[in-house]
């Protein structure tokens, strides 16, 4: 097993969510220098006057967003508030982070790190 020593902080995504699934981040594939990607912080800001829900998935290579790979599913974000999640998720090589909202008005920011 590789010993990962150097972790580089990265902003993985910042985007306005739409009502269709969008790929926010794709985990890099580097066969000569294996890396491990960590997702550490997710902030979802609701800029509207009403509650909005969102789905966020860690989707395997060649997969689709399904309930079986959901990290958040119909997660409510109250009007004019920010939902924050601070938990470490190790992302498989070539997987993607995909998300959508019930309506427009959510901005998502995802931060993490890449270890070599």
Model-assigned labels for residue ranges:
Residues 44-49, 102:
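Short solvent-exposed strand-capping/beta-turn motif centered on an Asx-Ser/Thr pair
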Residues 49-51, 94, 105:
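A generic structural motif
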Residues 1-36, 92, 100-116:
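C-terminal interaction-tip segments
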Residues 42, 97-100:
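Short beta-strand His + acidic residue motifs that chelate non-heme Fe in jelly-roll/DSBH
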Residues 60-96:
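Intrinsically disordered, low-complexity Pro/Gly/Ser/Thr-rich segments with frequent PxxP/GP/PP motifs
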Residues 35-45:
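Short beta-strand elements of extracellular/lumenal beta-sandwich folds
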Residues 55-59, 109-111:
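Beta-strand signatures of extracellular beta-sandwich domains
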């Amino acid at each position: 097993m590789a010993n990962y020593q150097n972790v580089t902080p990265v902003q993985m995504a910042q985007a306005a969510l739409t009502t269709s699934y969008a790929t926010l981040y794709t985990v890099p594939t580097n066969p000569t220098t294996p890396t491990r990607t960590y997702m550490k912080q997710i902030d979802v800001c609701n800029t509207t006057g009403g509650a909005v829900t969102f789905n966020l998935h860690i989707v395997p290579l060649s997969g689709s967003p399904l309930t079986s790979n959901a990290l958040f599913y119909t997660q409510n974000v109250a009007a004019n508030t920010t939902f924050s999640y601070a938990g470490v998720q190790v992302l498989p090589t070539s997987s993607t982070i995909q998300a959508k909202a019930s309506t427009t008005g959510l901005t998502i920011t995802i931060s993490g790190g890449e270890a070599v």
